[in-house]
Amino acid sequence: MRLFGMCESVKKKAAVIVVVSLMAFCCAGFAVAAEHGAEAAPKGWVATDTFRVMNFAVLAIALFLLLRKPVAGALNNRIAGIREELARLEAQKEEARKALEAYNERLKMLDKEAEKIIEDYKKQGEAAKARIMESAQASAAKLEEQARRNIDNEFESARQKLRLDIFEQAVARAEALVTEKITPDDQHRLVEEYLDKAVL
């Protein structure tokens, strides 16, 4: 509502100025009346006292009528502002509570997720350990097999070398025996037998 084309804040300021001015005027009137009354002895109720009371009543009624709507409007606006502020604060409180619940839920989920990640890492570690152990056992088995083959090869090589040495020694010994014990007649007879076998 506009009073003489004024907005609410200007109207409030004007009402405050009017109230302060009227109170100052009344106080000045009481001070002047008291000053004049100090010269004479109190006489009781005087005609000016009636006018003063009437003046005060008119002023109070005028102030009441003038300020009733602006003060009521200001108080209503203030009450509405406080209600809006309370509603806004309640909404913020509710949002904060929901956000807190969401954060708590996320923290619980993060705890569960962290436990799951740790469990996954443990499983991966156990699987890696099993793979490493299996690989190490396979490598050890291969190394053992290769060592066994190498030992067998070395034994076989040593056997063949030993056989060859024994054979060479036997041949040398047989040759020595043959050269010692063979006579020219035996030699001639052996050559004849060999030639007969070769021709056949």
UniProtKB/Swiss-Prot annotation:
<feature type="transmembrane region" description="Helical">
    <location>
        <begin position="14"/>
        <end position="34"/>
    </location>
</feature>
<keyword id="KW-1003">Cell membrane</keyword>
<keyword id="KW-0138">CF(0)</keyword>
<dbReference type="Pfam" id="PF00430">
    <property type="entry name" value="ATP-synt_B"/>
</dbReference>
<dbReference type="GO" id="GO:0046961">
    <property type="term" value="F:proton-transporting ATPase activity, rotational mechanism"/>
</dbReference>
<dbReference type="GO" id="GO:0005886">
    <property type="term" value="C:plasma membrane"/>
</dbReference>
<dbReference type="GO" id="GO:0045259">
    <property type="term" value="C:proton-transporting ATP synthase complex"/>
</dbReference>
<comment type="subunit">
    <text>F-type ATPases have 2 components, F(1) - the catalytic core - and F(0) - the membrane proton channel. F(1) has five subunits: alpha(3), beta(3), gamma(1), delta(1), epsilon(1). F(0) has three main subunits: a(1), b(2) and c(10-14). The alpha and beta chains form an alternating ring which encloses part of the gamma chain. F(1) is attached to F(0) by a central stalk formed by the gamma and epsilon chains, while a peripheral stalk is formed by the delta and b chains.</text>
</comment>
<keyword id="KW-0066">ATP synthesis</keyword>
<comment type="similarity">
    <text>Belongs to the ATPase B chain family.</text>
</comment>
<protein>
    <recommendedName>
        <fullName>ATP synthase subunit b 1</fullName>
    </recommendedName>
</protein>
<keyword id="KW-0375">Hydrogen ion transport</keyword>
<comment type="function">
    <text>Component of the F(0) channel, it forms part of the peripheral stalk, linking F(1) to F(0).</text>
</comment>
<comment type="function">
    <text>F(1)F(0) ATP synthase produces ATP from ADP in the presence of a proton or sodium gradient. F-type ATPases consist of two structural domains, F(1) containing the extramembraneous catalytic core and F(0) containing the membrane proton channel, linked together by a central stalk and a peripheral stalk. During catalysis, ATP synthesis in the catalytic domain of F(1) is coupled via a rotary mechanism of the central stalk subunits to proton translocation.</text>
</comment>
<dbReference type="GO" id="GO:0046933">
    <property type="term" value="F:proton-transporting ATP synthase activity, rotational mechanism"/>
</dbReference>
<dbReference type="InterPro" id="IPR050059">
    <property type="entry name" value="ATP_synthase_B_chain"/>
</dbReference>
<keyword id="KW-0812">Transmembrane</keyword>
<keyword id="KW-0813">Transport</keyword>
<keyword id="KW-0997">Cell inner membrane</keyword>
<dbReference type="InterPro" id="IPR002146">
    <property type="entry name" value="ATP_synth_b/b'su_bac/chlpt"/>
</dbReference>
<keyword id="KW-0472">Membrane</keyword>
<keyword id="KW-1133">Transmembrane helix</keyword>
<keyword id="KW-0406">Ion transport</keyword>
